[in-house]
């Protein structure tokens, strides 16, 4: 898009403003896009490379499948273990079972019901399934009461042991203080006794106590 205006003598130059305007209009309409120094349509690629974030694979959540039979077996095993522990603790720390028939009768009734349910006929399976929740509830109550009794007894014994330890530490502290006081008193009595013995020996040997004359220092003028 180069053009110039020359003198009027030159016939090849533009002589009218209309011709100049027409020439500028044609040049503006027919100009090439590559002639622009800063074209608008050119996309400048970015120099920074695109980085993809590393995706950590997610672990599938483990699904636990528990059947009704497995749950019932686990509950029965837990009940048997608790009943055995309760029998051991009652035999060691409580009077004979004749003095406390209530708990023994309940435990025996629960075990008898469980045995009856386990030895039932095939025709009465549905009835046994209906009665099992009631038996489990009763056994759970007995187990809960036994556990609560054992926990209360343990808490009481722990408190008694702590109190006894505190009393022992206080008694030992008092005994050490008394020993120190007695030792100090004995040492004082011993020193006073030695002084009296020395004065007695002086009186026996010389008949009177020694008189020590102190020399008086005179100041020289």
Curated annotation (Swiss-Prot):
Residues recorded as bearing Phosphothreonine in the entry: 89-90
Keyword Transcription listed: yes
Sorted keywords for this record are: Elongation factor, Host cytoplasm, Phosphoprotein, Protein biosynthesis, Transcription, Transcription regulation, Virion
Q: What does the record say about induction? A: Constitutively expressed in abundance during viral replication.
Q: Where is the composition biased (Basic and acidic residues)?
A: 25-36
Query: What domain of life?
Result: Viruses
Q: Coiled-coil segments, which residues?
A: none
**Biased composition, class Basic residues, residue ranges:** 49-68
Concerning PTM, the database record says: Phosphorylated at multiple sites. Phosphorylation is necessary for cleavage activity. Phosphorylated by the viral B1R and F10 kinases.
Q: Name one Pfam family in it.
A: Pox_Ag35
Region: Disordered; residue ranges are 25-105
What does this gene product do? Involved in the co-transcriptional or post-transcriptional endoribonucleolytic cleavage that generates sequence-homogeneous 3' ends during late transcription. Involved in postreplicative transcription elongation on intermediate and late genes. Also involved in DNA replication and in multiple steps of virion morphogenesis. Required both for inclusion of virosoplasm into crescents as well as for maturation of immature virions (IV) into mature virions (MV).
Q: What do we know about how this protein assembles, alone or with others?
A: Interacts with the DNA polymerase processivity factor A20. Interacts with B1R kinase. Interacts with the late transcription factors VLTF-1 and VLTF-3. Interacts with the late transcription elongation factor G2. Interacts with itself. Might be part of a transcription complex composed at least of G2, A18, and H5.
Report the sequence similarity comment from the record: Belongs to the orthopoxvirus OPG110 family.
Name used for this protein in its record: Late transcription elongation factor OPG110
Q: Which organism is it from?
A: Variola virus (isolate Human/India/Ind3/1967) (VARV)
* Encoding gene, per UniProt annotation: OPG110
């Amino acid at each position: 898009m180069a053009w110039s205006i020359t003198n009027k003598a030159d016939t090849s130059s533009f002589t009218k403003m209309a011709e100049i305007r027409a020439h500028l209009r044609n040049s503006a309409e027919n100009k090439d896009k590559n002639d622009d120094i800063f074209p608008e349509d050119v996309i400048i690629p970015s120099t920074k490379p695109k980085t993809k974030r590393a995706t950590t694979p997610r672990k599938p959540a483990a699904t636990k499948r528990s059947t009704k039979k497995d749950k019932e077996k686990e509950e029965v095993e837990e009940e048997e273990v608790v009943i055995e522990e309760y029998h051991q603790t009652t035999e060691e720390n409580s009077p004979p079972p004749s003095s406390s028939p209530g708990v023994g009768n309940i435990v025996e009734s629960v075990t008898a019901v469980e045995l009856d349910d386990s030895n039932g006929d095939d025709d009465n399976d549905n009835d046994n399934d209906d009665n099992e929740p009631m038996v489990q509830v009763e056994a759970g109550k007995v187990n809960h009461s036994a556990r609560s009794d054992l926990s209360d007894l343990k808490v009481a014994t722990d408190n008694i042991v702590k109190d006894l330890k505190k009393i022992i530490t206080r008694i030992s502290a008092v005994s050490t203080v008394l020993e120190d006081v007695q030792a100090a008193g004995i040492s004082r009595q011993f020193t006073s006794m030695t002084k009296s013995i020395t004065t007695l020996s002086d009186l026996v040997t010389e008949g009177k106590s020694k008189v020590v004359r102190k020399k008086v220092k005179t100041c020289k003028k």
